[in-house]
Amino acid sequence: MLASGSTARARMLEQAGIAFTVDVAAVDEEAVKHSMAAETRNPARVAEILAELKAVRVSARHPGALVIGADQMLDCDNVWFDKPADRQGARAQLLALRHKTHRLTSAVVAVRDGRRVWHHTEAAKLTMRNFSENFLDGYLDQAGEAVQTSVGAYQLEGLGSQLFLSVEGDFFTILGLPLLALMDFLRENGELVP
């Protein structure tokens, strides 16, 4: 059971041949992030808490089921970024990230009967190139509303790759799910054939 509405996460699981169903948890992520900001500036901890909260909420509706929750945080220069609400927000985010290195931290949590049974957090570092504003406007025109579907206003697996100079870290983590670690856990627990 996947406690996420992310099409990227669902696509990764499908392409890996993992059977699952989706049940999206109703979580006010902004409220959680706001309250956590006062407690910690650790994006890995916030991603883990959000992932667990989603999985626990869905687990309550599915007794006995293994529920996977995931979340991702983007931080740059001690600032947390969210999915942009519109083109203007996407443009502002990309300008703030231009010619800088930012970190994407992805957390995945497994919950059964309301209890966390496993978790994993992984981070990747991405450096954007010093693109021109002319390029940026063309990118936003071509990408369209897709820029609103992911934190950072890009999809590295597509057109967004043109924004980058270098990437350090696991590709699946960048897409929002540390898939290799998750599959290892699923094999160890009899959910996948070893």
Swiss-Prot record:
One of its GO terms (biological process) is nucleotide metabolic process. GO terms for cellular component: cytoplasm. It is found in: Cytoplasm. Keywords: Cytoplasm, Hydrolase, Nucleotide metabolism. It comes from the Bacteria. Its cofactor is a divalent metal cation. InterPro entries: ITPase-like_fam, Maf-like. Its main location: cytoplasm. It catalyses: a ribonucleoside 5'-triphosphate + H2O = a ribonucleoside 5'-phosphate + diphosphate + H(+); a 2'-deoxyribonucleoside 5'-triphosphate + H2O = a 2'-deoxyribonucleoside 5'-phosphate + diphosphate + H(+). Belongs to the Maf family. Nucleoside triphosphate pyrophosphatase. May have a dual role in cell division arrest and in preventing the incorporation of modified nucleotides into cellular nucleic acids. This is Nucleoside triphosphate pyrophosphatase.
